[in-house]
A protein has these predicted regions:
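Extracellular "leader-to-stem" segments immediately downstream of a signal peptide or signal-anchor
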Residues: 4-11, 16-85, 90-103, 107-214, ...
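Short, T/G/N/S-enriched strand-turn elements that build extracellular solenoid repeat scaffolds
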Residues: 73-77, 92-101, 222, 231-237, ...
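Active-site-proximal loop/turn and secondary-structure-junction residues that shape catalytic pockets
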Residues: 90, 237, 247, 286-288, ...
Length: 463
């Protein structure tokens, strides 16, 4: 194995990035919280360092470097773990599978670009996420570079959400139009083969950008994550996760372009991030229905000092959360240009119960719909379908023990909206808030009025 002699400055930056995460500097975010939680344990990465270029990788945007990434991961693994440095350049690759005690470090002007050829994401007939890890510990993705999922080669497009020029650009790629020209699918493209027999089957094979499953001690810091085929960053059943200073972005109309989705995780810090995406911004999920009961709830999550621009919701719980969501603090965040600000959505068959959710010091502007919305009959509408209301009689959503204070929302169409019964929406307190509404101050359905039994308002200005 050849190990390139990295510059002292590069090595110092890498070590500083991971050392600051292990030195307990996140403790200041946990002072005087409304609920008890401790800062997550950061990953422990050995000091070994290699460059991806040492393994034959070429950053020319043309050479496919999948095997070079795999070889670098194997090599650093034999050393007990360490840092894999991605220098400046465009590094085209297929899926990257991380192992224990590895830091993937992107230097400034480094761009990891995932292959637009869907066949490069296939293994044993199944598609792989762009970056993944399963049942691993001490994983980090750090630096100042960009990770790009090439999502436009995967996502369906709705004609009503793009300009004439953009629509013609998609048509020039080839593809398949459906629903009377209202939809375009990247099936039958001019330059790349399909991986499914029809466009509907291929649509279901879209991959996530970064999917970490059953992992412990995870750090994602500083990088830009953009243009995912589906969700961007989705830790699932992970413990001790830190997401710090990350930019997550994709076109506003990207189908299912969720930003940060926390699914059945515990002890998570989400801090100093910027999100600008096509679906939910920062979202808590906990599985839907009976299958979710074998998993732990989302628990002990701190979300603070983040900015969300376009998203369907700035902070979201749902739609599936049957395992429960508890002990969450959402503090000092800004939402500018989101469809909704605080969004609580679910439906029978996928609901669960919330507990000890504290939200305060939230600043919103230019909110397209509601500043705060509770919805218990949410209908998921996959692209190309009409959607269908749930007929389930079990796993009813119960949004309760939610406390919202010190929210200022300017230019929101509706201040507070709730759709559901007092059995599903109760124990909600909203205090010391001001909502400047452009259409109506409130919209209630099923709940007759604000009050002790459902949503209690105290010192709230609705203008």
């Amino acid at each position: 194995m050849i190990i390139r002699q990295l510059s002292a400055i590069t090595l110092a930056i890498i070590l500083l990035t991971t050392a600051t995460a292990t030195a307990g500097d996140y403790g200041r975010y946990y002072d005087k919280l409304p609920i008890k939680m401790a800062e997550p344990d950061a990953p422990q990465i050995p000091d070994n360092t290699v460059s991806i270029a040492d393994f034959g990788a070429v950053g020319d945007g043309i050479t496919l470097n999948t095997e070079a990434f795999a070889e670098a991961i194997r090599a650093i693994g034999k050393l007990g773990g360490g840092h894999i440095v991605i220098p400046a350049g465009i590094w085209l690759t297929g899926p990257i599978v991380l192992k224990d005690r590895i830091d993937l470090h992107l230097e400034r002007n480094a761009l990891i670009l995932f292959s637009p050829d869907k066949k490069d994401h296939l293994k044993d007939g199944k598609v792989q996420s762009c970056i993944s890890a399963s049942k691993r510990s001490d994983i980090s993705i750090t630096g100042e570079g960009i990770i790009d999922g090439n999502g436009e080669w995967w996502r369906a497009v709705k004609r009503g959400k793009v300009s004439d020029t953009e629509w013609k650009d998609f048509q020039r790629m080839g593809g398949t139009e459906a629903d009377g020209g209202k939809l375009w699918y990247p099936f039958g493209l001019k330059n790349y083969d399909d991986i499914a027999p029809d466009f509907k089957a291929q649509e279901k094979m879209r991959v996530h950008m970064i999917r970490l499953t059953d992992c412990e001690r995870v750090l994602v810091k500083g990088v830009t994550i953009q243009n995912s085929p589906k969700f961007h960053l989705i830790p699932t059943r992970c413990k001790h996760v830190i997401i710090d200073g990350v930019t997550v972005r994709c076109p506003w109309n990207a189908q299912n372009g969720d930003g940060i989705d926390i699914s059945c995780c515990q002890d998570v810090l989400i801090v100093n991030n910027t999100v600008d995406v096509g679906d939910d911004g920062i979202c808590m999920k906990a599985g839907g229905g009976a299958a979710a009961l074998k998993y732990p709830p989302v628990a002990r999550i701190l979300i603070r000092d983040n900015t969300v621009f376009h998203a369907h919701g700035g902070f979201v719980i749902g739609s599936e959360f049957s395992a429960g969501v508890e002990d969450v603090a959402v503090l000092s965040n800004t939402f500018s240009g989101t469809d909704t600000g605080l969004r609580f959505k679910s439906a029978p068959g996928r609901g669960g119960k919330t507990a000890r959710i504290y939200i305060s010091d939230i600043y919103m502007s230019d909110i397209r719909d509601q500043a705060i919305v509770f919805e218990t009959s949410y209908v998921d509408v996959p692209v190309g379908t009409a959607g269908k209301a749930s007929e389930a009689q079990d796993f009813l959503p119960e949004f309760t023990d939610i406390h919202i204070s010190n929210v200022v929302a300017r230019d929101t169409r509706i201040g507070i909206a709730a759709k559901g019964t007092t059995q599903m929406i109760h124990g909600i307190s909203i205090s010391d808030c001001a909502f400047f509404c452009t259409e109506k101050i409130a919209e209630l359905s099923g709940i007759e009025a604000f009050g002790e039994g459902s949503i209690k308002l105290e010192n709230v200005k609705l203008l």
